[in-house]
From Swiss-Prot:
Residues the record marks as active site: 291, 312, 426
Keywords, comma-separated and alphabetical: Cytoplasm, Gluconeogenesis, Glycolysis, Isomerase
PROSITE patterns: P_GLUCOSE_ISOMERASE_1, P_GLUCOSE_ISOMERASE_3
Pfam families: PGI
Family: Belongs to the GPI family.
A GO molecular function held by the record: monosaccharide binding
Gene field: pgi
NCBIfam families per record: PRK14097.1
SUPFAM superfamilies: SIS domain (SSF53697)
Keyword Manganese: no
Pathway assignment: Carbohydrate biosynthesis; gluconeogenesis; Carbohydrate degradation; glycolysis; D-glyceraldehyde 3-phosphate and glycerone phosphate from D-glucose: step 2/4
EC number(s) from the headed UniProt entry: 5.3.1.9
InterPro entries assigned: G6P_Isomerase, Phosphoglucose_isomerase_CS, SIS_dom_sf, SIS_PGI_1, SIS_PGI_2
Name of the protein this chain belongs to: Glucose-6-phosphate isomerase
Length: 450
């Protein structure tokens, strides 16, 4: 096993003391046992727990084979999905690939350009994307359990038409890959009818926990990232976080501290990074915790920030605003690349004291200074140390946060594996759009909107 993630809770004191963590140990252990024995709410959606070791090896091999086909066939790869159907893969690709992977010259890339669609209903976004890719060789991965989710269904209609016009029906079917239910749903029916290659979304894995299934693995593999290393990292994390000793289990300690802070009125957790490539990891994390904990009038509100950028916009509020915040910093110990700051003879900017230092050194001092400043301002800080941003540590991070999320949801007394609240806006939207069966509701809503 490589070096693991490590947790520094020094700057959560005096808000949470060690005896409070120890007090929660037996409760957390009980919640973990509930997860493991599959006796709690949502127990039909716990397939993610053993995915790192019990994944479908035959399908995994097909994913890698399909990824090679896509890389050899296409200039552009379009990933169509929303929420958990795209955030995990995008988080991995942005974290591990070149920051400007889509802008590199073709001779500098060994993989297609990768763009995401079906995660909004903006006509401008779609029109701009179509304009960008219309003259390129395109492959599409449409990801939807049902095939009827509005955003990806609209996007797939548009790209299916584009590909069939461009390549004909036979040519298009070789370029469309569907990740969907094993046996039922509109997308499964269409894929079988048209002859698309398909990959299965397991019945026992919810969308926001699905990054280690074909949902995330096919786009990640197309990007050139080593999916074997991702699974290895997740498997090692699964083993490490199986300990029931709170002194050794960082998942237990993270759950204990964030929930102790929540009980003391710290109702917002900010996941903070100092690497721009972690932006979409923050978006993935927000969905994971927002949908899992935010119900029954409960839950820690998940926010994310990209420092030092957001220190120049949100820094004032974090330092002196409402004291209901705590932060979880992702500290990347070793950057992928280094840049040395050179000496300047004029020194008009006064920065020669940084000459011959690595930019990453400056970045780390900014992180350390921010932790101290915010702590002085009444904001507790959890620091999660990550040795480097690689496929292996992406797998570790995913499993760390997923397991912590499951335990934390049970600790708060909610079902962390459903999301009934997301249906409310959909019903209103369908009624206002005139979907058959919503006629009475449409009239009521139109009256309310006057």
């Amino acid at each position: 096993m490589e070096n693991s993630l490590s947790l520094d809770l020094t700057k959560t004191k005096p808000y949470v003391e060690e005896h409070e963590i120890q007090y929660l140990e037996s409760i957390i252990r009980e919640m973990d046992n509930t997860l493991g024995k599959k006796t709690g709410p949502g127990n039909k959606f716990l397939g993610w727990m053993d995915l790192p070791i019990n994944y479908n090896k035959e399908e995994f091999a097909r994913i890698k084979k399909a990824a090679e086909k896509i890389k050899n066939t296409c200039d552009v790869f379009i990933v169509i999905g929303i929420g958990g159907s795209y955030l995990g893969s995008r988080a991995a690709i942005e974290m591990i690939s070149n920051t400007f992977y889509n802008n590199l010259d073709k001779n500098q890339r060994t993989v297609p350009q990768i763009y995401f669609a079906g995660n909004n209903i903006s006509s401008t976004y779609m029109a701009d994307l179509l304009e960008l890719v219309k003259d390129k060789d395109i492959c599409v991965n449409v990801i939807s359990k049902s095939g009827t989710t509005t955003e990806p269904a609209i996007a797939f209609r548009i790209f299916k038409e584009l590909l069939e016009k461009k390549y004909g029906k036979e040519g298009a079917k070789e370029r469309i890959f569907a990740t969907t239910d094993a046996a039922k749903g509109a997308l499964r029916t269409l894929a079988d009818l048209e002859g698309y290659e398909t990959f299965v979304i397991p019945d026992d894995v919810g969308g926001r926990f699905s990054v280690l299934t074909p949902v995330g693995l096919l786009p990640i593999a197309v990007s050139g990232i080593d999916v074997d290393e991702i699974m290895k990292g997740a498997a090692d994390a699964r083993q490490e976080y199986s300990s029931d000793n709170i002194e050794k289990n960082h998942v237990y300690r993270y759950v204990a501290v964030r929930n102790a802070l929540y009980r003391k009125g710290k109702t917002t957790e900010m996941l903070v990074n100092f690497e721009p490539c972690l932006h979409y990891f923050g978006e993935w994390w927000k969905q994971l915790y927002g949908e899992s904990e935010g119900k029954d009038g409960k839950g820690i509100f998940p926010a994310a920030a990209d420092f030092s950028t957001d220190l120049h916009s949100m820094g004032q509020y974090i330092q002196e605003g409402l004291r209901n915040i705590f932060e979880t910093f992702i500290n990347v110990e070793n950057p992928r690349k280094s840049i040395i700051i050179k000496e300047d003879k004029e020194n008009l900017d006064g920065l020669n004291f940084l000459a011959e230092k690595d930019m990453d050194y400056v970045n780390h001092q900014a992180l350390r200074g921010t932790v101290l400043a915010h702590n002085d301002g009444g904001v507790p800080a959890i620091v999660l140390n990550v040795p480097e941003l690689s496929a292996y540590y992406f797998g570790q991070l995913v499993y760390f946060f997923e397991k912590a999320c499951g335990i934390s949801g049970y600790l708060q007394g909610v079902n962390p594996f459903d999301q009934p609240g997301v249906e409310a806006y959909k019903k209103n939207m369908f009624a206002l759009l005139g979907k058959p069966g919503y006629e009475d509701m449409k009239a009521t809503l139109e009256e309310r909107l006057k």
